Amino acid sequence: MSQTTYPLKPVVPFIKVTQDRAVLEIQRGCIRGCRFCQAGMVYRPTRPRDINMLKETARAMLKNTGHEEITLSSLSSSDYNELEEIVTFLIDEFHTQGVNISLPSLRIDAFSLDVMSKVQDVRKSSLTFAPEAGTQRMRNVINKGLTEDDILNGAGQAFEGGWTKVKLYFMLGLPTETQEDMEGIAVLADKVARRYYEIPKDQRNGKCQITASSSFFVPKPFSPLQWATMQPMEEYIRRAGIVQEAFRNQLNRKSLRYNWHTAEVTVLEGVFARGDRKVGKVLEEAYRLGCIYDAWDEYFDYDKWLQAFENTGVDMDCLLYTSDA
């Protein structure tokens, strides 16, 4: 990996964009084995980049772009053995320039308070963790390798280090999921908030904000769950409603927020994840019908996509709800 070419002069947009930052890939692949994850399977083996190469690349990218933020990118940043060294280097090198460091892929069981405390010294931000499921049974099914104690201990370290905002990512519609698993998302988020309020009041930084987000499970090819059946769109919406109601019943509900991915978009993700060359015709037909900027909610028109499938004769249900598509 250290011998491969890395873009030192990425294009800088002349307008304000969402991902307005330099991106530094610190390693490729993942040492974990989550059963839903395509990237963790197809990018094996894990290949870390040389620390000296990363330092020179970061220095060049920030000089050439003028960005005020750099993201240390990988499938699991906290599994990079020299993470603390690269973070310390970036802080020492660019502290006076106010460069923010983003660590988007942290495992809560590998949370390093020392590393994150250094990051906070530059500019405070929220922390994001991905328990993926609300109960231990469901996490075992997907081989997440996280216990509730891991989650609460990691969150506790973050709170004691001064953070008050935590984002938690979950998935709905996983194989064998029960109502207890769905409601467990709200219960776990509440336990995380409760962990914050266990800190003496004079040592807290005001109230905490726990934001839980759920996407809907899409079976990915080349993953162990590639042949699992997707749930109908209406079922995804029903399950999100169950979780939302569970959040309303939690003790610390004022500190909790919940949102979920658009079910219609999930259906399309499932089609393109599991489809063969025939879905290329659907994509072209959707474009001809005017589906151009559909990544933005205000432009997304599900009816046009349904029309595209009808016009091309591609059966969505066959791709989504059977294992022999």
Which residues make up each language-model segment?
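Short acidic (Asp/Glu) and glycine-rich catalytic loops that position anionic groups and cofactors
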Residues: 5, 31-39, 63-71, 133-136, ...
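Short glycine-enriched, charge-decorated loop/helix-capping segments at active-site entrances
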Residues: 41, 141-146, 226-232
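Canonical Radical SAM [4Fe-4S] cluster-binding loop centered on the CxxxCxxC motif
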Residues: 15-52
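Sequence-structural signature of the catalytic-core scaffold of metal-dependent phosphohydrolases
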Residues: 292-313
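Conserved SAM/AdoMet-binding glycine-rich loop
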Residues: 59-211, 215, 219
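Conserved small/polar residues in nucleotide/adenosyl-binding loops
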Residues: 321-325
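N-terminal [4Fe-4S]-dependent radical SAM core
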Residues: 1-23
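Radical SAM enzyme [4Fe-4S]-AdoMet core and its adjacent flexible, acidic
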Residues: 214-260, 265-294
